[in-house]
Amino acid sequence: QSDVKFVSNLQDLILLVQQMQRAVVKAPWSSSGRGVRYLTAQMLQDPGFSRWAERIIEKQGGVTVEPYYNKVKDFGMEFEAIDGQIVYRGLSLFQVAKNAYTGNVLASEEEKEEILQSYVSHEQLEAISQHVCEVMQPALKGVYSGPFGVDMMVCAKEPGSKDVFINPCIELNLRRTMGHVALA
């Protein structure tokens, strides 16, 4: 994502969040949303946030800062890296409450595409999955073999707007995800 920045000090982090006004700050290595903070520029005054950010920067070398998107719907795509090739396994539709995973939709691929069709076409989904395969194949070849998932999001351009876009990579999970389990 071109709008995601990696910063390695608290001063740069504060500056970026002030510029964005609303941002998502993520630890590079975390799970289940525990390394994620949703911020407004006003929340930067919280000493608890500063302590958290400094600790992550010290232990992990930095944090990522990205815009806070106007989420309409969460979804993902599941893949597997096998013998240097990337295989698309299917869609993952899941629910999130208070920014934490709560469960997956158990449905056929056709039913999941039907749920998403008011936001994204079959052709767009195919193009996104193909692009992930093309990008991840050289990135993972000889480095990682196994399942992985890419969390994605349908976003409104403005709060409450019907004008939407797809963010094709909110997060990359180099592991078996609950989306893989739902596909089984």
Language model regions located:
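Short acidic/polar capping segments at secondary-structure boundaries
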Residues: 10-12, 28-32, 69-71
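A long amphipathic alpha-helix within ATP-dependent nucleotide-binding catalytic cores
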Residues: 58-67, 88, 101-164
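Active-site "cap" helix and flanking loop/linker of ATP-utilizing ligase/carboxylase catalytic domains
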Residues: 139, 175-184
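Phosphate-binding site of ATP-dependent enzymes
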Residues: 20-21, 47-101, 153-169, 173-177
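Nucleic-acid 5′ end/cap handling module spanning
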Residues: 38-40, 164-169, 182
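Active-site-proximal flexible loops/turns
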Residues: 33, 158, 178, 182
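Phosphate-interacting basic helix/loop segments used at nucleotide- and nucleic-acid interfaces
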Residues: 3-14, 131-141
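Glycine-rich phosphate-binding loop of ATP-grasp-fold ATP-dependent ligases
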Residues: 2-7, 22-49, 76, 98-116
